[in-house]
A protein has these predicted regions:
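Generic N-terminal amphipathic, Lys/Arg-enriched alpha-helix
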Residues: 1-18
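Short amphipathic alpha-helical segments, especially helix-boundary/capping motifs
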Residues: 2-7, 33, 66-68
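A short alpha-helix capping/helix-coil boundary motif
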Residues: 7-10, 35, 101-103
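A short, well-structured juxtamembrane/interface segment
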Residues: 18-36
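Residue-level recognition of short, well-ordered coil/turn positions
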Residues: 37-38, 64
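Short glycine-rich phosphate-binding loop at a beta-alpha junction
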Residues: 39-43
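Glycine-rich phosphate-binding loops that contact phosphosugars or nucleotide phosphates
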Residues: 45-124
Length: 124
């Protein structure tokens, strides 16, 4: 039980420290996106790519928001990596998606990326 109690305490502490204003701001962005028929592009690498792919399903099915993820099309993504390089694969995929002003980009990242250390440079 000690582990479970510790887990619950730590989870509560994290939840208590979430910025409610920022969460509300994100909700407002998503509500406006749906109202204006914008598209949501969700990016992630590693585990974040799996979360991005699953989030596309939830936003489409539950929220009625047109959503896309570059890692859902492995053929296109790997062709871009092969032809253009990993560092520009996502930005070029986004360019090919013809983003417009009413669209949004959501990025799942654990480390946030770092150009100097070459960590998740394709999402920076």
């Amino acid at each position: 039980m000690e582990f479970i109690d510790k887990y619950f305490r730590e989870s509560k502490e994290i939840i208590d420290n979430l910025d409610k204003k920022q969460i509300k701001k994100m909700v407002d962005y998503l509500v406006n996106l749906r109202k204006n028929s914008g598209r949501l592009f969700i990016l992630g690498v590693g585990g974040g790519a799996g979360h991005a792919s699953h989030a596309v399903n939830d936003f489409r099915k539950i929220c009625g928001i047109e959503s896309y993820c570059p890692t859902d099309n492995v053929s296109e993504l790997t062709a871009r990596v092969n032809d253009e390089g990993w560092n520009t694969s996502y930005v070029n995929w986004l360019k090919g998606s013809n983003l417009i002003e009413k669209d949004l980009i959501l990025v799942f990242s654990v480390g946030g990326g770092n150009l100097e250390k070459e960590i998740s440079v394709n999402i920076v």
